[in-house]
Amino acid sequence: MEHCTFNLPDVQASKPSIAINLTRVGVTNVKKLVEIKRKDKRPIVLISTFDVFVDLPSDRKGANLSRNFEAVDEVLEKILSMPVYEIEQLCSDIAHNLLGRHEYANQAEVRMTSEYMIRRASPATGIKCQEVVNIFAEASAVRGQGNDDYFDVKKLIGAEVVGMTACPCAQEIMRDKAANELSELGVDKDTIIKFLERVPMATHNQRGRGIISIKVAHDFDVSLESIISIIDHSMSSSVYEVLKRADEKVVVETAHMNPKFVEDCVRTMADNVVKEFPNLPDNAVITIKQTNEESIHRHNAYAERVALMGDLRSEINHC
């Protein structure tokens, strides 16, 4: 009996009924185990989530999504044979690989999120604990006009860190009340001033969430550890998973001796980004966000700054 053979049509390559181009087509929530090597330290193993996209021209019905998985897997396999030190470079390599596989696409994007464990000690007793920091990276590759073999690659690295803030406004109200009460009790003015300088007044607190992301060209590297440190030190105090009573005293006192509005946190981060990264190019894109979860209000407080590094550097240097 003679068997008939059929050539299966490439449905994705057929023309769509509505011929418009699409900005992003791809896959989201792809889970992968990623090992990042470190100099003179043990590697970091991350359980990471990837979103992978390419653009789609108007004359094509669909994208070959299996190629997205192949691109991610191929680049991750290379980690076994060569050291990878930055998650943003990993995203950059995947984006570059995507454009090579999707010949019809002009742009590829990769996003990666993960939880990064850091070890730290409590401020007074030195109890060791592990803290979780949310980290993320992105990369985009754009095919060069007139040269399909040239890809313009940009990459982004960032982190979100949780801390604590103390409200300056409410603290001034309580400071004024304390001064009046002490005066009525017969305490002289100089003693009141000395007391208020040594003992911080009560105020309401917020759990703050600071975010910094830095976008650069493919040939620049940005320290993730520096980003995390900048965010952590921009708020009134760090927070810790485990605290003894002596530690609680230090955290509360530190926060109330360093009260900050949500705007102060963003400005502090901006100032420290300029100081910490003097070699960043002027066209690097800096995004800084701070959300303070209010304790006495139903709303949250928010502030943000997006700027080119050159503009930020110029503003701060002229303050």
Swiss-Prot record:
It comes from the Archaea. Its EC number is 3.5.4.39. Pathway: Cofactor biosynthesis; 5,6,7,8-tetrahydromethanopterin biosynthesis. It catalyses: GTP + H2O = 7,8-dihydroneopterin 2',3'-cyclic phosphate + formate + diphosphate + H(+). Keywords: Hydrolase, Iron, Metal-binding. Its cofactor is Fe(2+). It is an enzyme of class 3 (hydrolase). Binds 1 Fe(2+) ion per subunit. InterPro entries: GTP_cyclohydrolase_FolE2/MptA, GTP_cyclohydrolase_MptA. The record marks C167 as: May be catalytically important. The keyword Iron applies. Gene3D superfamilies: Urate Oxidase. GO terms for molecular function: GTP cyclohydrolase I activity; GTP cyclohydrolase IV activity; iron ion binding. The keyword Cell cycle does not apply. GO terms for biological process: tetrahydromethanopterin biosynthetic process. Belongs to the GTP cyclohydrolase IV family. HAMAP family: GTP_cyclohydrol_A. Homodimer. This is GTP cyclohydrolase MptA. The gene is mptA.
